[in-house]
Amino acid sequence: MIDADGYRPNVGIILMNERGQLLWARRVGQNAWQFPQGGIKSDETPEEALFRELKEEVGLDPHQVEIIGKTRGWLRYRLPKRMLRHNSKPLCIGQKQKWFLLSIRCPDASVCVDGTETPEFDGWRWVSYWYPLGQVVAFKKDVYRRALKELIPSAHRRLEK
């Protein structure tokens, strides 16, 4: 599903542990790391897409996490020209994302990034809150910065409990 402006609706998932560290996942066969994310189907709400993607990409069920924050609006990034699929219609020029900050409520061993036939990730680790800004691919960096900045008050509230 691509909107009239060429953006694919998507959810971004930031999983935080009790120490304030974030789950950082390595894309299959690459040395590229990112937060889990995925498209919103036409018959889904962003929350439904969040939980579907959470299960597919990280192996967690809704009862194993708690939503502690989400971005107010859509955050957009454009794909680099080399990544555009000009033969697909309508043309997708980027993604618009709703970001969710989740508190993980289960042991680390519950995380399973390779539990599907075609996993997105082949590894993961916990990193400090701002670490991803120095590591994510350039075209996603501004969206990551905006999401982390908007969600940090929710992270602080959780850590103060």
Curated annotation (Swiss-Prot):
It is an enzyme of class 3 (hydrolase). Its EC number is 3.6.1.-. Its cofactor is a divalent metal cation. One of its GO terms (molecular function) is mRNA 5'-diphosphatase activity. A motif (Nudix box) lies at residues 38-59. InterPro entries: Nudix_hydrolase, NUDIX_hydrolase-like_dom_sf, NUDIX_hydrolase_CS, NUDIX_hydrolase_dom, RppH. Keywords: Hydrolase. It holds the Pfam family NUDIX. Residues 6-149 form the Nudix hydrolase domain. GO terms for biological process: mRNA catabolic process. GO terms for cellular component: cytoplasm. Accelerates the degradation of transcripts by removing pyrophosphate from the 5'-end of triphosphorylated RNA, leading to a more labile monophosphorylated state that can stimulate subsequent ribonuclease cleavage. Belongs to the Nudix hydrolase family. RppH subfamily. This is RNA pyrophosphohydrolase.
